[in-house]
Amino acid sequence: MSYYGAGMLRARWASWRDWRQQRRGQANARWGWIKPPAGRGPAIWMQGFADFDDLRLAADLAKAIREKRLDLRVVLTFEAEHPDLLEQMDGVPGLGYGFGPCDHPQAVARALERLTPLRYLALGAPPRRHLAAALTQRAIPAVLLGTGPGLGPLPPVEAVYPRNTEQAEAWRSLLPAARIEDPVDFSTLITVAQVEPNFRALACGGDDWQLWWVAGVSAASAGRWIQAWQGSPLRRSGLLFLSGQGVAPAGLERMSRWARTPLAPGSALWVDEGRWHPALAVAAQGVHLEAASTGDIWQAFAGGRPLSAAPLSRLSRPEAMGPELVPILTAPGAVLARWQGLLGDPMAAREQGDAARRAFWAERRRAGERLPAFLERVFAW
């Protein structure tokens, strides 16, 4: 990921590289040269940083804000580009998007001068140190969603919408209780909840293989998963799907190159396209969350399959991820042994999957009930 901190030399170096690679818009925006949409209405600055799931939510909220307040101009900035996501925002009146500034005081000041925002909204992380200080200096209220507090100074917080109880507790010593909303995860509203269950037929043909999915695999851990898989009896009648960030590990076929023909039992594939995740969540007999994003976590819950997980940060994991519903497992062999046990106890597997699905829908209902109040806050600005 490109540099967006406060260091002058590193930020200049990052911008020079962007210029060399014809990314002039990113280079200019890093130093605050951001242009709001045309118009005279007040501007709202939404900062989505680099996380794909936070940006998905930011894009949907930006469109909802525009529908609620037609006079507002909404500026959504990010630090990593996702072209498929950005296409969804093309043509929305009063909505602009692009790369954001780094945290050097000069870049922050220039961005705020050009945007003169009525409010600042951050999703997934709090504003960095110099931006938080500048918001305070200019008395620009901030609304923070899905994040705990950072290590630097606080901006003038109007409200926080924590994702879970742990985030809410982290705010209690810093803010009056009236500014801390009850925990809610709005990302459940953009989770794909209804999926046609045809992926199994595509992968297995006329055979009845079991499908297993591990989400959030790193390149370093992929080898351990393959080694454990090759020694597991599940391999005789199963297919293993590993998804994660970065380049596919050596020897693993990528889903983007899969010819959509039935797979042989024992096959292992690297899922390098996120569009397959909803189908995998529904088709798999079991899902393990190694270092998964919030989006993948809720997608797995929505799929209604037995879940397990590696230890995840308490500040970022969903409220529903208690050990009674999602056992904590670290070694690939332990996960495969759990899956083997689920094959021998289909009733328990069904009950665990149903409980996961109920947890997803309960959180989605809460988010749906809370969203109108958030939009009413926007309407009152």
Where do the PLM segments sit?
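Positively charged, low-complexity intrinsically disordered leader regions
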Residues: 1-40
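A short, well-structured juxtamembrane/interface segment
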Residues: 26-39, 151, 194-203, 220-225, ...
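Active-site and donor-binding regions of nucleotide-sugar-utilizing enzymes
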Residues: 29-32, 41-190, 217-221, 232, ...
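Conserved catalytic-core segment of nucleotide-activated headgroup transferases in glycan assembly
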Residues: 53-68, 191-262
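Nucleotide-activated donor-binding/catalytic signature segment of Leloir-type glycosyltransferases, i.e.
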Residues: 89-99, 249-272
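Acidic donor-binding loop of glycosyltransferase active sites
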Residues: 115-119, 265-293
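Catalytic binding pocket for nucleotide-activated donors in carbohydrate/polymer assembly enzymes
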Residues: 157, 278-359
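C-terminal alpha-helical cap of glycosyltransferases
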Residues: 363-381
